Amino acid sequence: VLVACSEGEQEVVVPTSECATGLKWDAGDEGSPLMNPGEDCIACHKREGEGPDFTVAGTVFPGLMAADDCYGVEGATVIITGADGVEHRMTTNKAGNFFTEKTIKTPYTARVSYQGKERVMLTPQTSGACASCHGQTASAGAPGRIALPE
């Protein structure tokens, strides 16, 4: 389920006033597990007709506000529990991205675990396109980005 880095990934160092982590993706749609943090992976892959067929995908950020392409947080665990009780665990990569192609029974619940703390999503979901609500501009009642627990 998790990622492997490939050669040719491009990131740039930016001021922390621009991106909290000080890193930003700078390679456009160059195929990589680190690409386009914060953007809607599932919608893009369907629209472009290429890339893995993710069932759940998103990015974990240090806080609720972050611009698209800013790197998120590496090493957080995203736990998706399907309606059947099966847990699917994903660890965020260097860009904060997580994803899976496994079938997940909906509605599912979600939580983020990091350094002994958890943040729980309160409402069960049927879409795995996390950034469709947790985007640069939050929608559908989301408070903002998927953020680390406080």
Which residues does each predicted region cover?
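Short, ordered, surface-exposed loop/turn motifs in non-cytosolic proteins
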Residues: M65-D84
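C-terminal motif of bacterial Sec signal peptides marking the signal peptidase cleavage site
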Residues: L2-A4
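Short, acidic Ser/Thr/Gly-rich low-complexity loop/linker segments typical of extracellular
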Residues: D84-A95
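A short, amphipathic beta-strand motif
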Residues: V56-P62, G96
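Short Pro-Gly-centered beta-turn/loop motif in secreted/extracellular proteins
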Residues: F99-T109
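Bacterial signal peptide processing site
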Residues: S6-E9
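The canonical Cys-X-X-Cys-His
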Residues: P37-E48, S127-A138
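A short, solvent-exposed loop/turn motif at the edges and junctions
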Residues: A110-T126
